[in-house]
Amino acid sequence: MAGTGHTPEEALALLKRGAEEIVPEEELLAKLKEGRPLTVKLGADPTRPDLHLGHAVVLRKMRQFQELGHKVVLIIGDFTGMIGDPSGRSKTRPPLTLEETRENAKTYVAQAGKILRQEPHLFELRYNSEWLEGLTFKEVVRLTSLMTVAQMLEREDFKKRYEAGIPISLHELLYPFAQAYDSVAIRADVEMGGTDQRFNLLVGREVQRAYGQSPQVCFLMPLLVGLDGREKMSKSLDNYIGLTEPPEAMFKKLMRVPDPLLPSYFRLLTDLEEEEIEALLKAGPVPAHRVLARLLTAAYALPQIPPRIDRAFYESLGYAWEAFGRDKEAGPEEVRRAEARYDEVAKGGIPEEIPEVTIPASELKEGRIWVARLFTLAGLTPSNAEARRLIQNRGLRLDGEVLTDPMLQVDLSRPRILQRGKDRFVRVRLSD
């Protein structure tokens, strides 16, 4: 391609890596052969303001399009956010106000900027209220006439809800048309999304055809599984790693990635070659986790991640690739500090910086407090009953010692260190 040093075929090969599906692939190649900057669209309804590594999968692929000279258009769904995308939902999503979506969007755009380049020829930010708010009812009828109710009910999430007798609001059926009209408004060549967006993106192709435009290519990326090893990464499921996590927190969470997920995390979140990934996995989960944690913690500690999170980037940090071993003098200071603290805790130590909670004197009886109540007040357990269960299973510690007595009364005349599992600590003290 002009100015990038890649032929269209080479560019396609780069873009295909990690993609789940490109619909249709031959149309993407044809568009690349036109030799012009393509308009690559991503729609985002900022129902939650914080981004995580699951979002990074799609955003990094868009960054790759930018590095090849194409323009990314990030469409903030301030209007569609008031409808609520039903994709992957088992029930109607509560709508947000226009003000709520725009407030969330500020954080969303700032965090996406850690990944996307924002030069004017490579990036454009739009709000879909620009064109959707002014649509006439006549235009809405025209849009909805392009599909049948039967076609809408073929969509997996609607189908499941319909068969289960769970209500589907009519406004939810309008969402795919609104998203499709976004593609018409900006004349999208490519629309990005996760696999759960397949239906919506295909509707975009049909609507563009109806408006006399060349249909967009649907570029679908896999959904990143979260730290629980079961569901897609989601803040609501508390199985996420945020893009703006402090280095220590990010490193710690990456070391907790379930072993079976390591291959997908390397393939979707880094640019390591396949043979390099295989070598890491063969070396074992511990060195593989360390390389993953070092790479991503270092990359996201930067104001903007590097174009490629690869072996060259790893070695530029001062780490030796071949050994995969620990070099205490290597790496940026924040990564070295995060790794050192992780190792300290893994060996049974207590981190230097831990959250602190004050306990009101009214909770004490004769200067003491029930241990289960103490852990609940500290936020380490959701209930006294759960605290008792964990103590019976030797899952809680007080000042480094394993607790065995669920009825223990704890003296709070001095600060105490509470611990749940290997890496959750709280210092508690009596309020003044």
From Swiss-Prot:
Enzyme Commission number, as recorded: 6.1.1.1
UniProt keyword annotation of Flavoprotein present: no
GO cellular component: cytosol
First-listed, main subcellular location of the protein, grouped into a coarse class: cytoplasm
UniProt xrefs under InterPro entries: aa-tRNA-synth_Ic, Rossmann-like_a/b/a_fold, S4_RNA-bd_sf, Tyr-tRNA-ligase, Tyr-tRNA-ligase_bac-type, Tyr-tRNA-ligase_bac_2
Pfam families: tRNA-synt_1b (PF00579)
Quaternary context: Homodimer.
Protein name: Tyrosine--tRNA ligase
Originating species: Thermus thermophilus (strain ATCC BAA-163 / DSM 7039 / HB27)
